[in-house]
């Protein structure tokens, strides 16, 4: 994840917008009291996938990406989630192939891609472009067949439009991935999601980032909801030995639904 203004902490793979940042988006013209649709007209439909067969992936997993290039992947690990991009859309994590090879040795895995909105052009076309590019980068690294993709939605990414435009970009990305035959989830936090995407509630699985903290605090956040879903995965940033890493665990209510959150062996 990329660093931006104020105290945005970049630790581990996805990282976390640790400080409360003021929203850089607006939800429509000033003075209006109406509640506009959370998506622009013509936005694609995002489907809520049927449940996968019962599966579990107990224990702590890790997400890694370009910040961990050249470093040994964490073990033991219950599962691994690897970033395709190099901190921004339309860029490559140059260690993706090696890092995903690590994830394939684990009982479950997934990938994530960076989201943003440039503020110019068609939000739907822009979102679809980001997905097409990410899939091409995945294949260029010799990786294919990953069935679970997460959209990284953070204030540290570029958001140069309204919440309605932002949400439409995200809808286009999710729908494009679903058309490619994969399952989709949202990585964010309740605060960040509200500031970026407003009231849009697609009902996709969500991965809740609490930032620096403890496992106990992360598990306590499992009841939090955003984007129309209760937290399925939680992430906390902490030391593992001498290293600071993004730790992740499946929430208790989802303990037998690992297949809805990860690509389970």
What positions do the PLM features span?
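Aromatic-lined carbohydrate-recognition surfaces of secreted/lumenal glycan-active proteins
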Residues: 177-195, 208
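N-terminal export and membrane-targeting signals
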Residues: 1-7
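Functionally critical loop-and-helix segments that line ligand-binding/catalytic clefts
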Residues: 39-74, 201-265
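C-terminal region of N-terminal signal peptides and the immediate post-cleavage residues
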Residues: 12-43
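Glycine-rich, charge-decorated loop segments at or immediately adjacent to ligand/cofactor-binding or catalytic sites
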Residues: 126, 192-203
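Substrate-binding cleft of extracellular glycoside hydrolase catalytic domains
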Residues: 48-182
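Short, solvent-exposed coil/turn elements at secondary-structure transition points
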Residues: 67, 115, 190-192, 239
């Amino acid at each position: 994840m990329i660093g931006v203004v104020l105290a945005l902490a970049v630790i581990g793979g996805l990282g976390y917008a640790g400080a409360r940042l003021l929203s850089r988006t607006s939800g429509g013209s000033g003075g209006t009291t109406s509640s506009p649709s959370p998506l622009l007209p013509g936005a694609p439909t995002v489907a809520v996938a049927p449940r996968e067969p019962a599966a579990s992936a107990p224990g702590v997993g890790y997400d890694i990406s370009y910040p961990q290039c050249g470093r040994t992947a964490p073990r033991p690990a219950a599962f691994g989630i690897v970033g395709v991009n190099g901190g921004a859309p339309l860029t490559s994590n140059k260690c993706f192939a090696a890092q995903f090879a690590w994830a394939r040795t684990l009982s479950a895995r997934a990938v994530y891609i960076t989201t943003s909105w440039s503020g110019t052009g068609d939000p739907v076309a822009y979102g679809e472009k980001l997905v097409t590019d990410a899939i091409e980068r995945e294949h260029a690294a010799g990786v294919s067949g990953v069935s679970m993709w997460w959209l990284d939605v953070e204030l540290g990414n570029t958001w140069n439009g309204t919440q309605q435009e932002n949400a439409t970009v995200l809808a286009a990305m999710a729908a494009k991935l679903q058309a490619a035959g994969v399952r989709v989830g949202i990585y964010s936090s309740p605060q960040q999601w509200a500031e970026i995407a407003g009231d849009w509630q697609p009902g996709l699985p969500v991965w809740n980032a609490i930032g620096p903290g403890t496992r106990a605090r992360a598990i306590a956040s499992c009841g939090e909801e955003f984007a129309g879903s209760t937290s399925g995965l939680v992430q906390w940033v902490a030391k593992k030995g001498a290293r600071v890493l993004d730790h992740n665990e499946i929430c208790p209510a989802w303990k037998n639904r690992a297949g809805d959150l990860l690509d389970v062996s």
